[in-house]
Structures are given as C-alpha cells and as structure tokens.
Amino acid sequence: MNKVLAIVLTITVAGFAQTAFADDHAMSPDMKLLAGASNWVNQSGSVAQFVFTPSPTQPQTYEVSGNYINNAQGTGCKGTPYPLSGAYYSGNQIISFSVVWSNASANCQSATGWTGYFDFSGSQAVLKTDWNLAFYSGSTPAIQQGQDDFMQSVATVSESLLTE
C-alpha cells in the first residue's frame, strides 16, 4: 500500500511540475512580466523593481509600484531605494513611472519621470525609456533629459534595500 501511494504521489507531483514548466514556457513575455516583482537594470547600473497590480477601473491597465535604486556615477541619492509609482498599459506594453528623490536617507529635492515601452522582440527583454529630471540648479528650476535602456535582471535585490 505504501509503495502504491508513493508511486501515485510521485506521478502526481511530477505531473504538476511538468504542467507548471509547460505553462511557464507557454506564457507570453508580457504575462511573465505581470506575474510578480521583476528587476530591471539600466546602463548606469541603477535598478528598477516593478510590481504590477491590475487597475480596478481601467481594462488592460496596471498600477505600478516598487523601488528604484540609483547607481549612476556623479549623482546624489545613490545606493538606497526610493519608492516608484506609475502605470502600465498591457495592450501595447507602454509604461510610465516616476521617483521623488526623498526618503529617510537623503532628500535630493528632485523628481524623475520615465516613459517608455517594453520590447520583447529580441532574445532578452528591454525597457526603452526617455526621462526628465526636474531639479533646482542654485535657485533656478531646471529639467534635464535623457534616455535609459533597462534589461531584465534575474538577480534579486536585497530585501533590506527594498524596505528602507
């Protein structure tokens, strides 16, 4: 009886594992993106962690939350997480998110907004964005513009960094 039960359990577990593996490979890149938290690293080594929550009122739209860790050389507010928020439209993979550079560690008195799209056409997914950084240069407000390309990262960000 125990041998039969063990064989049935083994077959059942193997069947579930095979189904989960097949489902993961059949899932579109867009759906994998929405399945949980994902980390994206840009050319400066900065990390954006996104969590997508379905909008209760807008179809195919997701609220974006998470953290951004700035690692760009020559900038302030580095190495510590800042909350990010935004929106994602899954109909054509368009995203917009922003960060206010103020937390318990530092206040850089500035804000950055990124707008872009996810490109799933290559062997590795890319998030292509344009950004605007609003800040004060002395006593004069200014806006700096640029572009970031983020690559999805399989590395995890330390939980302590994400909760600071």
Curated annotation (Swiss-Prot):
Biotechnological application?
A: The specific properties of hoefavidin make it an attractive target for novel biotechnological applications, including drug delivery, nanotechnology, and molecular labeling.
Q: Which GO terms describe its cellular component?
A: extracellular region
Q: Which residues form the signal peptide?
A: 1-22
Gene3D superfamilies hit by this protein = Avidin-like (2.40.128.30)
Q: Per UniProt, what is one Pfam family of this protein? A: Avidin
Predominant location category: secreted
- Cite the InterPro entries for this sequence: Avidin-like_sf (IPR036896), Avidin/str (IPR005468)
Residue span, Avidin-like domain: 32-155
What the record says about temperature is: Is hyperthermostable. Displays a Tm value of 84.9 degrees Celsius, which increases to 96.2 degrees Celsius upon biotin binding.
Residues bound to biotin are N42, S46, Y68, N70, G76, S110, T112, D148
Q: What is the effect of changing P83C?
A: This mutant forms a disulfide bridge stabilizing the octamer and preventing dissociation into dimers upon biotin binding
* Record family assignment: Belongs to the avidin/streptavidin family.
Q: What is this protein called?
A: Hoefavidin
What species is this protein from? Hoeflea phototrophica (strain DSM 17068 / NCIMB 14078 / DFL-43)
